[in-house]
Amino acid sequence: MKPFTIHRGKTAGIDRANIDTDQIIPKQFLKRIERTGFGQFLFYDWRYLSDGTPNPEFELNRPENEGATILVADENFGCGSSREHAPWALQDYGFRVIIAPSFADIFYNNCLKNGLLPIRLDKEDVRYLLRQSERADYELTVSLEEQRVFDDEGFSRPFDIDPYRKQLLLKGWDEIDLTFVYEAHIAAYERRHCPRP
């Protein structure tokens, strides 16, 4: 995974609550075994009309949202079935951060395990960010080290994250990488405690 320390990026807002994983990445696109290539299917049923052409009314299809790396949405983002493909699709599309008042627990943890930073902010703060996200030039800075989200206009809010998950993101590690860090300790433990022939 890529280390996450500070990220500055354009925001895009989807002003909807209860966006479920079936909307994030529809089931017909889950047959792939790679972790890449899912971005083209992100929000497929909303992004495309029935004839396959882009839906000009959908937020992410608007020109002002092109290149956005921070997604702002309403509460209970990522509810529904547990599919790790949802964070993969968001990342593959280009998002590094998702901001919402609340997330479904499994989705939240899947994001952290895959290097996508989900940030919970108060509903009023999210409403403000959704309004600001309508501007083509609006950017946010996210400092994981300081656990803070801020813009150039005076908005600044702290956010909470589990210290263990924070360290993994800062280093760009997943749980397998962490195991390799302790490989010598694990081998020493096995030598001391495993039965010998």
UniProtKB/Swiss-Prot annotation:
SUPFAM superfamilies associated with the record: LeuD/IlvD-like (SSF52016)
Enzyme Commission code: 4.2.1.33
Pfam families membership: Aconitase_C (PF00694)
Single GO cellular component term: 3-isopropylmalate dehydratase complex
Superkingdom classification of source: Bacteria
Pathway named in the protein's UniProt entry: Amino-acid biosynthesis; L-leucine biosynthesis; L-leucine from 3-methyl-2-oxobutanoate: step 2/4
Region forming the signal peptide: none
Keywords: Amino-acid biosynthesis, Branched-chain amino acid biosynthesis, Leucine biosynthesis, Lyase
Any GO BP: L-leucine biosynthetic process
Its biological purpose: Catalyzes the isomerization between 2-isopropylmalate and 3-isopropylmalate, via the formation of 2-isopropylmaleate.
Family: Belongs to the LeuD family. LeuD type 1 subfamily.
Subunit structure: Heterodimer of LeuC and LeuD.
PANTHER family, A to Z: 3-ISOPROPYLMALATE DEHYDRATASE SMALL SUBUNIT, 3-ISOPROPYLMALATE DEHYDRATASE SMALL SUBUNIT 2-RELATED-RELATED
Record protein name field: 3-isopropylmalate dehydratase small subunit
Species of origin: Geobacillus kaustophilus (strain HTA426)
